[in-house]
Amino acid sequence: MTIDLDLQTVTLERDGHVLVMGLGRPEKRNAFDRAMLADLSRAYGLLERDDSLRAGVLVAHGDHFTAGLDLLDVAPTIAAGESPFPADGRDPWRLDGPWTKPLVAAVQGRCLTLGIELLLAADIRVTAADARFAQIEVLRGIYPFGGATVRLPRDAGWGNAMRWLLTGDEFDAAEAHRIGLVQEVTDDAAAARARALELAHAIADRSAPLGVQATLASAQLARSAGEAAAFERLQPEVVRLFGTQDAAEGVQSFVERRPARFQGR
């Protein structure tokens, strides 16, 4: 099922409770110009505000995930300190505050610069075995400004992150898996996309939406405000969840030995 949102460079497909978002400039290796940044921002905005959507999947059309920024088009906007994101969108690098919907990303081919940062902003990442990664900003006189300087050291460890951030060298899917940039490696692009969709549906179709949101919120709070702040919220949040219809349904479905039918209430 398609969705009525006027986007030119990003495709949208609703698959049950999952929104599949596809980078759609394959003729340019999915390099991000201003239009594509705005389109992906609006797609992420839709994912967050549509209560019927419980998870998102980010994929790319063509042979490559992304060649990074189209610097000739985007550089003037970035250099002027202007935001490329519309009012009804969200920051695709997820630097604009808490998010309530989990995101699974599938990558193939070349994944450069902001592509790596899109992966780091996702909750689960799957790659095809042919993928090649590089954070090449330092080779262009700038530096990664979409979160890699913060997230890659945190996720991969300082040495692993600096090995690639400071040199701009290319690395393969096996190395991406070793350092924790991706969680799974599949045979090819089709398998990566299928696995990402499978994981998203495991979340959207089986897990209670309120439980998923509370889990994300707790983990995000620990990262942004520290463990003590997250620990302080554990008991109050579980008390709140025990009072929901979904918690009652979780117990009842267990007693009746049937799949739970969660409503997000």
What function would you assign to each model-found segment?
Residues 26, 126-131, 182-232, 245, ...:
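C-terminal long alpha-helix characteristic of the crotonase
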